[in-house]
UniProtKB/Swiss-Prot annotation:
Lineage: Eukaryota, Fungi, Dikarya, Ascomycota, Saccharomycotina
One MF term in the entry's GO annotations: sequence-specific DNA binding
Organism per entry: Saccharomyces cerevisiae (strain ATCC 204508 / S288c) (Baker's yeast)
Source domain of life: Eukaryota
Protein name, as recorded: Pyrimidine pathway regulatory protein 1
UniProt entry keywords in alphabetical sequence: Activator, DNA-binding, Metal-binding, Nucleus, Pyrimidine biosynthesis, Transcription, Transcription regulation, Zinc
Subcellular location: Nucleus
Binding residues annotated for Zn(2+) 2, in chain numbering: 34, 51, 54, 61
SUPFAM superfamilies cross-referenced by the UniProt entry: Leucine zipper domain, Zn2/Cys6 DNA-binding domain
Gene Ontology CC terms: nucleus
């Protein structure tokens, strides 16, 4: 019986093997052990494409060629299918249709016959007539197909896995020589031993290395909510003549680009002094700006706790005449931290190698700033060391200095910002070794905020991932767990959670990624609206601060309004952009849900948004509420997978919301109050493109006149140009938008002088180009002053007098034709009435065009974020370290938040 049972199993395995690798062609695969299992002399399960042992150890699973002894794929069928799929995907990314490429071997009777001469010439490409497997042929095909970007295409976008692994190993080697400044907090228990801290250090260095792998941005997922596009016009404009034209010779742009080098020099300055502190008055200004502009929206720091725990040990008591989001209430100078509290600083003995003079100056009653200042006067810097008890205060102060100084990016000094951040990361290991994990979470959240503003290692996506893991590990999303803590701790936990929630929803919405914590798992209440001066550690009579009314003004109304708009935005993204999202049962259809969401958005703007400084208890710029209001309407009624076409109502709402967004950013630019640079670039470019889309396609007079379109177009370009030097993707977006806006305006507002019809030529696109070229000579369609922005209000008269931006339309439309199906344009008529579709076309033709428009918007929705999101990913998400931020080149093929630190 046992023998029969064994034979039965063997028979089953044999039947499985006969099925082969591919169910479609029935090719039997060789059942042989892999190389590693052979060398280890262990049983191989012979699974494809990798055995379980190799997959578990994350090592290549290959076989040995019995003839040559060299490594070979375990299945050539799997290998060739994968290789072909990769090449076809890369060709599509570069605008080449793989299905139109014909080889020498015919596949159907309609193909060209076999050419023996071509087959014989293959032997010249490699030994024994075999094509080389080093990627050169793939490089050649991709570069050949990428005709619209014939200028320098960096080879990094096609780096082989071997190259990426080498880069990762080099980073790991270099990171061992550093001081652990790139660490991330893990989610384990408090760090009470050196072994646990060392384990955390190694783990987070690996995360940092993962975040710096310079793989192609196309390998990084960017979802539908990251942006929309309108067909091949966008694709052509973003790849057309990027390295030619007036911008290359623009000295102003070249000077702006020099700022990248300043940031890199600050990151690598060998004379860096980690102990240096700004003067007290400068520190007070930056801290005040941080609390008004950033902490008011994300109240992760309790004001009095911050002053008592971090500021006073370094600078001494705070000046009561300086408000910290406390214009109407003041600061509670009697705030105390009980020694038994979990929030008290656990000091350690002073280092023994510090001189006697420094010991005296470092007494309990003397702030460390006085000690440091004294050491500078008597030239004792070489022997001064920072006591361990000041490491965490140094981190918090310096990262807040960096954020506070960078909130007005057009005024800030990029070198100073980088230096403050570098000092903070010098002491970040002490933060992650703290027994207070809420403190570690708050510090990491500050790093996330900085990473949104400036390049950082690891990037914001990986830092935010660590924050989310720690948040879930602490149970901050669950109100049930919060009930186990005292009122003050419960309040801090709620505040930290909603800060994490806001940042997660913001980042994921911009880049179309799944949210870190699902809505159905969140039960945590909103934090209290009381001002921080009324929330103390010593009041044991209060059970829950969130239950108390707030009779006095408080900046918490700003944060609460931001929490609510993030929830609305998250609902929009989840319903309209997530492929598997379900509509709430109380709604009959998507349109009824959208109307209800629109009404909810209006209620938020009219009721929840504070209307004056007195209510906000500080001078927070309320323009950020306008920005979120317009942005939310844009994503609610703009193109999305659930609404790939727009009706008249959507066209009207999106037109108004995009103009509102452009006005807000232009106002911030004029007043030099833009911050969070890459978010501003991303939002401004996407909004500008959406504005052009609406004006290009909308009918029934739902569009702006030529003068108005030109005015808003220049506003977009002014903002993008002023951000060059602070965000590397700004120049790419500036050039692409400049080209596309000129073409769209000429297409939309051209005047037809030829009565013979616009498609008299055999090439419809070339015919359009000829007409546009003649029109360009007669009309000043679009002109831009590339001089330095002088901070003056937009002058329409001066704008109309400027020389037009000359676009070689013959070349543009020739390039456009390469990526468009000409038959799609056969019924197009750019008439004087601005009708895109010929009114005399048949019903069937119109239906076909509508179907094509539906598919077009659905299929190529990712074109725009190749310019912003792809480049932003490379710059801020997987940025390489070692101070090379200012030197990295930009590839056009690879490729929101601003007043004084406002977060859009």
């Amino acid at each position: 019986m046992k023998q029969k049972k064994f034979n039965s199993k063997k028979s089953n395995r044999t039947d499985l093997s006969k099925r082969g690798d591919s169910p479609n062609i029935g090719i039997s695969k060789s059942r042989t052990a892999c190389k590693r299992c052979r060398l280890k002399k262990i049983k191989c399960d012979q699974e494809f494409p990798s055995c379980k042992r190799c997959a578990k150890l994350e090592v290549p699973c290959v076989s040995l060629d019995p003839a040559t002894g060299k490594d070979v794929p375990r299945s050539y069928v799997f290998f060739l299918e994968d290789r072909l799929a990769v090449m076809m995907r890369v060709l599509k990314e570069y605008g080449v249709d793989p299905t139109k490429i014909r080889g020498n071997i015919p596949a159907t009777s309609d193909d060209e016959p076999f050419d023996l001469k071509k087959y014989s010439s293959v032997s010249s490409l490699g030994e024994e007539g075999i094509l080389p497997h080093n990627g050169l042929l793939a490089d050649y095909l991709v570069q050949k197909g990428n005709s619209m970007a014939s200028s320098a295409i960096t080879s990094k976008s096609m780096a082989s896995p071997q190259t990426i692994n080498v880069q990762r190993k080099e980073f790991l080697v270099n990171s061992k020589k550093q001081d652990g400044s790139a660490l991330l907090p893990e989610t384990g228990s408090p760090m009470t031993s050196d072994a646990r801290a060392e384990e955390l250090r190694r783990c987070n260095k690996e995360i940092s290395a993962l975040g710096t792998m310079r793989e192609s941005s196309f390998n990084s997922f960017l979802g539908d909510s990251s942006g929309i596009s309108f067909a091949k016009l966008v694709f052509t404009a973003t790849n057309f003549r990027q390295d030619s034209g007036d911008d290359v010779l623009d000295e102003d742009i070249k000077q702006r680009e020099q700022k990248y080098n300043g940031y890199a020099e600050a990151e690598n300055n060998p004379h860096f002094d980690p102990l240096e502190l700004p003067p007290r008055h400068a520190a007070e200004v930056m801290i005040s700006r941080f609390f008004v502009d950033t902490n008011s929206q994300l109240p992760l720091l309790h004001r009095e706790l911050f002053l008592k725990k971090y500021f006073e040990p370094i600078y001494g008591p705070w000046n009561p005449n300086i408000a910290l989001a406390s214009d109407q209430t003041g600061i509670n100078s009697a705030f105390e931290i009980p020694i038994t509290s979990a929030f008290s600083a656990h000091t350690e003995p002073k280092r023994e190698n510090v001189t006697e003079k420094i010991d005296v100056c470092s007494s309990v009653d003397v702030p460390w700033y006085d000690t440091w200042e004294t050491s500078q006067k008597v030239n004792m810097r070489p022997i001064v060391e920072l006591p361990t008890k000041f490491h965490i205060p140094y981190f918090f102060l310096n990262i807040i200095f960096a954020i506070g100084h960078a909130t007005q990016v057009l005024k800030s000094d990029i070198t100073t910002v980088a230096t403050y951040k570098r000092r903070a990361t010098k002491y970040i290991a002490s933060l992650f070794s703290s027994s207070d994990r809420l403190e570690a979470l708050a510090g990491t959240l500050l790093m996330v905020i900085y990473s949104i503003m400036r390049p950082n290692v690891p990037g914001v996506w990986y830092t935010m991932g660590s924050v989310l893991r720690l948040t879930v590990d602490l149970g901050l999303h669950s109100e049930k767990i919060n009930k186990n803590y005292d009122a003050f701790t419960r309040e801090i936990r709620r505040r930290l959670f909603w800060c994490v929630y806001s940042l997660d929803r913001q980042i994921c919405s911009y880049f179309g990624r799944p949210f870190g914590i699902p809505e159905e798992s969140i039960t945590t209440r909103y934090p209290s609206l009381l001002d921080d001066s009324f929330i103390t550690l010593t009041n044991r009579e209060i059970d829950d601060y969130s239950d108390l009314p707030s009779p006095n003004p408080s900046s918490k109304v700003i944060a609460l309004a931001m929490y609510k708009i993030r929830r609305i935005q998250a609902s929009i993204v989840r319903i309209l952009y997530a492929p598997g999202a379900e509509l709430p049962r109380r709604f009959m259809d998507l349109e009824s849900w959208r109307i209800e969401t629109y009404n909810e958005l209006e209620r938020w703007f009219q009721v929840d948004v504070p209307k004056n400084f007195e209510m906000m208890n500080c001078k927070f710029n309320s323009i950020w509420f306008d920005l979120n209001y317009h942005y939310s309407k844009s994503i609610l009624y703009g193109l999305s997978p659930k609404f790939p076409t727009l009706n008249d109502t959507a066209f009207k709402i999106v037109l108004d919301s995009t103009k509102g967004t452009i006005d807000v950013f232009y106002n911030l630019c004029v007043n030099k109050k833009i911050g969070y640079t890459w978010v501003a670039v991303h939002n401004m470019f996407m909004t500008g493109m959406t504005y052009l889309y609406v004006n290009f396609y909308s009918k029934n007079n739902i569009n702006d006149c030529q003068e108005k379109v030109s005015e808003y177009t220049e506003k977009v370009l002014i903002v993008l140009k002023n951000l060059i030097g602070f965000c590397e993707s700004a120049k790419t977006c500036y050039t692409s938008y400049k080209i596309l806006s000129s073409v769209v305006i000429k297409l939309k507002f051209m005047q037809i002088n030829d009565a013979k019809g616009i498609f008299s030529d055999s090439n419809p696109l070339t015919s359009q180009a000829n007409r546009m070229s003649s029109y360009d000579k007669k009309t000043n369609v679009l002109g831009f002053d590339d001089g330095t922005f002088d901070n003056k209000v937009f002058n329409r008269t001066n704008f109309e007098e400027k020389a037009p931006f000359d676009i070689p339309l013959d070349e543009f439309f020739t390039e456009l034709e390469k990526h468009s199906n000409v038959s799609q344009f056969n019924t197009l008529d750019v008439s004087e009435g601005n009708q895109v579709i010929n009114e005399s076309a048949s019903t069937n033709t119109s239906s076909a065009l509508n179907c094509q428009s539906y598919t077009n918007n659905q299929d190529i929705m990712d074109i725009l974020f190749q310019v912003t999101s792809g480049s932003v990913w490379d710059e801020f998400f997987v940025r390489s370290g070692n101070g090379n931020e200012g030197e990295s080149s930009y590839d056009i093929s690879k490729g929101k938040n601003s007043e004084s630190g406002g977060i859009f």
